[in-house]
Curated annotation (Swiss-Prot):
Function: Septins are GTPases involved in cytokinesis that assemble early in the cell cycle as a patch at the incipient bud site and form a ring approximate 15 minutes before bud emergence, which transforms into an hour-glass shaped collar of cortical filaments that spans both sides of the mother-bud neck. This collar persists until just before cytokinesis, when it splits into two rings that occupy opposite sides of the neck. The septins at the bud neck serve as a structural scaffold that recruits different components involved in diverse processes at specific stages during the cell cycle.
Highest taxon of the lineage: Eukaryota
Protein species of origin: Saccharomyces cerevisiae (strain ATCC 204508 / S288c) (Baker's yeast)
Ranges of compositional bias, category Acidic residues: 156-167
Pfam families per UniProt: Septin (PF00735)
Protein name per its UniProtKB record: Cell division control protein 3
Primary location: membrane
PTM: Phosphorylated by CDC28. Phosphorylation at the end of G1 may facilitate initiation of a new cell cycle by promoting disassembly of the obsolete septin ring from the previous cell cycle. Sumoylated during mitosis on the mother cell side of the bud neck by UBC9/SIZ1. Sumoylation probably plays a central role in regulating septin ring disassembly during the cell cycle.
Biased composition (Polar residues): 497-510
Gene Ontology MF terms: GTP binding; GTPase activity; molecular adaptor activity; phosphatidylinositol-4-phosphate binding; phosphatidylinositol-5-phosphate binding; structural constituent of cytoskeleton
Keywords from the named record: Acetylation, Cell cycle, Cell division, Coiled coil, GTP-binding, Isopeptide bond, Membrane, Nucleotide-binding, Phosphoprotein, Ubl conjugation
Amino acid sequence: MSLKEEQVSIKQDPEQEERQHDQFNDVQIKQESQDHDGVDSQYTNGTQNDDSERFEAAESDVKVEPGLGMGITSSQSEKGQVLPDQPEIKFIRRQINGYVGFANLPKQWHRRSIKNGFSFNLLCVGPDGIGKTTLMKTLFNNDDIEANLVKDYEEELANDQEEEEGQGEGHENQSQEQRHKVKIKSYESVIEENGVKLNLNVIDTEGFGDFLNNDQKSWDPIIKEIDSRFDQYLDAENKINRHSINDKRIHACLYFIEPTGHYLKPLDLKFMQSVYEKCNLIPVIAKSDILTDEEILSFKKTIMNQLIQSNIELFKPPIYSNDDAENSHLSERLFSSLPYAVIGSNDIVENYSGNQVRGRSYPWGVIEVDNDNHSDFNLLKNLLIKQFMEELKERTSKILYENYRSSKLAKLGIKQDNSVFKEFDPISKQQEEKTLHEAKLAKLEIEMKTVFQQKVSEKEKKLQKSETELFARHKEMKEKLTKQLKALEDKKKQLELSINSASPNVNHSPVPTKKKGFLR
């Protein structure tokens, strides 16, 4: 064999040896997997205490046996010599088939949730006396919903009214004006059930719909309250220290519809058009026990047609890909049953079967709160609490709040560049921070001006009232003094007349008086 042929054979041998090496590795992997099938089955049957040992063994299973790779050294290949095949390198590969531990993440989340508890902010809107408070007490099975008043927007005005008590008709007119305003009150309570704590915040709207002319002023305070809670959360996110953000955003809005049985009023449609993009809207027909089943079905159909024509979107329970048929059917039923015809009562009555149930007793029978044949109370509880409370909070955070945040920042002139390779410009960053800071200052300035103007107007009213009272008092005293002066003059004239009539013949010439001094 010539030297040229030997060099060609040397160049072809590595390719052949690579193919042989791959075949040998495949056979070796199959053998190793068969050898360790029994060990893995023993591990999965309960021997989970050796996780760390097996993990270390798996890491150290990749071994390289001593030998000459490919059987050819560099010096021999340069000389053109061919050596016999040498023992090849053996690779042992293993996969970790043991228990890693991330399946315990739900348990960790459960433990953390039990420790921290949950929070839920619920807005109740409807006319006074429609049963908002009663339904809240029935939903959460707690009669102390209104025990802790956290925030009252009319508190300052009430304090001013107390200072002005007993000061005339001006106070009565002012208090009458205050009674015709929507008052927003926030109540907080901690409810515990089976070791799970819920921080419940119920926001009530007193005076809604009580105006003779229910224009935009009827729902403006409610919209401002929702926006202010979004602004508070946005300001908390922009702070340096964000570990203690208290979420006060409205997670759901229960709108109470009067049980007229006909159609929605213009006020109902206008309010729901203004609020459905800011919170999860859930309409309910209050006091539905005054309607028959046929009237309820007809009323529901009319309401849904009006909402569709007005392009008002209600909260729709999501259906996930891994949901079974029962959960999917429940989600569809919860949405198709809107608006819910509900009743509220925590009174315990006895039904016809002799069982103690929550409900109301009438001369014609007993209506049960938790009976699906009597009301949609259980559907509302499933949607609001039992099944989709976290979905309500998630939609508020990821959709409604993000839409509000984007529009808010866009109004401030802050735009986002979606390019991936974006250079950091400190000047533009500083300009954005300056814009945000100026917006905050402008907001604070507007709030301070509003408060200042309010205080000034209240002080002016007090001064005007005091001035009016002083003028009235001065006038009254002047008239009184004038009457007294006139009475004294009349009395003087009477005395003079009586003196003249008593001594008619007396000489009224002046009597000379004695002079004092030494010249008398």
